[in-house]
Amino acid sequence: MRIVVQRVSHASVTIEGQCKSSIGKGMLILVGIEESDGQEDIDWLCKKIVNLRIFDDESGVMNKSILEDGGEILVISQFTLHASTKKGNRPSYIKAAKPEISVPLYERFCKDLSRALGKEIGTGTFGADMKVELLNDGPVTICMDTKNKE
């Protein structure tokens, strides 16, 4: 699984002109799933996300997790995170999982992340044409890949 975490002041996702989800201060997470992903990847990411210290403490130092800061999370599925630009100029998405694999994993990821956070999270709709709005805070943007745990 590959994710992009952005610290935001607020974020929302709109589908067909209707706001599906919106959050205040917290994280916007874009998530891409590949064929070989499974529960181990979900578990590692959920633990890492809720404990990631990217929120400022009283001294202005990024020393607090979203659990400590009380922020919200909005998760958006994004198969394009697995784009390969190795050949030519048109990205290939061959590494992205097909919907029959990625939809259940995305839903499980959202459910498990909500449980780890201790409250409901916002989500987009898998496969929909979404308009995502956000106000980056910092900006702070962190990329994580369960196949390359650095």
Swiss-Prot record:
Swiss-Prot/TrEMBL catalytic activity: glycyl-tRNA(Ala) + H2O = tRNA(Ala) + glycine + H(+); a D-aminoacyl-tRNA + H2O = a tRNA + a D-alpha-amino acid + H(+)
One cellular-component annotation, GO: cytoplasm
Family under the similarity heading: Belongs to the DTD family.
UniProt KW Translocase keyword: no
GO BP of this protein: D-amino acid catabolic process; tRNA metabolic process
Family annotation (SUPFAM superfamilies): DTD-like
Primary residence: cytoplasm
Function: An aminoacyl-tRNA editing enzyme that deacylates mischarged D-aminoacyl-tRNAs. Also deacylates mischarged glycyl-tRNA(Ala), protecting cells against glycine mischarging by AlaRS. Acts via tRNA-based rather than protein-based catalysis; rejects L-amino acids rather than detecting D-amino acids in the active site. By recycling D-aminoacyl-tRNA to D-amino acids and free tRNA molecules, this enzyme counteracts the toxicity associated with the formation of D-aminoacyl-tRNA entities in vivo and helps enforce protein L-homochirality.
The protein, known as: D-aminoacyl-tRNA deacylase
The EC number(s) this enzyme carries: 3.1.1.96
Quaternary structure and interacting proteins, as annotated: Homodimer.
Span of the annotated motif Gly-cisPro motif, important for rejection of L-amino acids: 138-139
Source organism: Bacteroides thetaiotaomicron (strain ATCC 29148 / DSM 2079 / JCM 5827 / CCUG 10774 / NCTC 10582 / VPI-5482 / E50)
Annotated signal sequence range: none
InterPro entries: Daa-tRNA_deacyls_DTD, DTD-like_sf
Compartment list: Cytoplasm
Domain comment, as recorded: A Gly-cisPro motif from one monomer fits into the active site of the other monomer to allow specific chiral rejection of L-amino acids.
Gene Ontology MF terms in the entry: D-tyrosyl-tRNA(Tyr) deacylase activity; Gly-tRNA(Ala) deacylase activity; Ser(Gly)-tRNA(Ala) hydrolase activity; tRNA binding
Key words of the record: Cytoplasm, Hydrolase, RNA-binding, tRNA-binding
Pfam families hit by this protein: Tyr_Deacylase
